[in-house]
Swiss-Prot record:
Keywords, alphabetical: Acyltransferase, Cytoplasm, Transferase
Lineage: Bacteria, Pseudomonadati, Pseudomonadota, Betaproteobacteria, Burkholderiales
Catalytic machinery residues: 204 (acyl-thioester intermediate)
Catalytic activity reported: octanoyl-[ACP] + L-lysyl-[protein] = N(6)-octanoyl-L-lysyl-[protein] + holo-[ACP] + H(+)
Organism: Paraburkholderia phymatum (strain DSM 17167 / CIP 108236 / LMG 21445 / STM815) (Burkholderia phymatum)
Protein name: Octanoyltransferase
Principal location: cytoplasm
Length: 255
């Protein structure tokens, strides 16, 4: 359980200790874990277990994952947005916000396991920072992304020189769950993937919404490169300071 410490009285010697612990915890660097290709259910179960067992001193983490083909439906999602139930792609009902989306090979998924109370960060502000991290990531590859009011995620800007018919297409989706002041789930960015499965759903509940990837817009970068850039952008936007993230090796990489 993600605990928020109870503040003792100013006279108590434990007050300074609690304050120091909170300060130390907030100052801890975000740990980036490269989990690679992983079944969605395994990631989902691991996120819930991590969030349920963390303490106030637990370091925040970002998990970088690539999933085999899967549709996920948010807790208030309408199953009617799955247009082709016979696609052969499994559907997993999850506890994040939002409607239905697709995850598959060639998509970078970043799961944000953050203690928002410790960071004094509101959910709306976290969403804004995640979206800005995606915009910054796209800009690193000379792509222009933009927000749309009332529709979380990032879309191809009409200002993108080679956008053509893809202007307004969705290139990144996000959805979060907050439990006891801690976040899990996160953001997905389409790098180079088979986009056909998106035709079997109303992406994020929007009928006829086009979904695009970076490769379609002329970007030749690989999954690892984009994942590294996205992780650094997420940390920079969440912590407000530049971050360097190493490429995957073994275990965890601390940024």
């Amino acid at each position: 359980m993600c605990a928020t410490p109870v503040s003792p009285s100013p006279e108590s010697p434990r007050s300074a200790q609690a304050g120091a612990a909170a300060s130390d915890a907030a100052a801890q660097p975000v740990i980036v874990r490269w989990r690679g290709l992983e079944d969605y259910q395994a990631s989902f179960d691991a996120m819930r277990a991590f969030t349920g067992s963390r303490s106030f001193e637990t370091s925040d983490e970002i998990w970088l994952v690539e999933h085999p083909p899967v549709f996920t439906l948010g807790q208030a999602g309408d199953p009617a947005h799955l247009l082709a139930a016979d696609s052969g792609i499994p559907l997993v009902k999850v506890d994040r916000g939002g409607q239905i989306t697709y995850h598959g090979p060639g998509q970078v998924v970043g799961y944000l396991l953050l203690d928002l109370r410790r960071r004094k960060l509101m959910v709306r502000e976290l969403v804004t920072r995640i979206e800005q991290a995606v915009i910054d990531t796209l800009a690193a590859y000379n792509l222009a992304g933009e927000r749309k009011a009332g529709a979380p995620g990032i879309y191809v800007s009409p200002e993108q020189p080679n956008a053509g018919l893809h202007a307004g297409a969705k290139i990144a989706a996000l959805g979060l769950k907050i439990r006891n002041g801690c976040s899990y789930h996160g953001v997905s960015l389409n790098v180079k993937m088979d986009l056909q499965p998106f035709l079997a759903i109303n992406p994020c509940g929007y009928a006829g919404l086009e979904t695009v990837d970076m490769a379609t817009l002329g970007v030749a970068a690989g999954w690892d490169d984009v994942a590294q850039t996205l992780a650094a952008s997420l940390i920079a936007n969440i912590d407000g300071i530049p971050a360097a993230v190493g490429l995957p090796q073994a275990g965890a990489i601390t940024a």
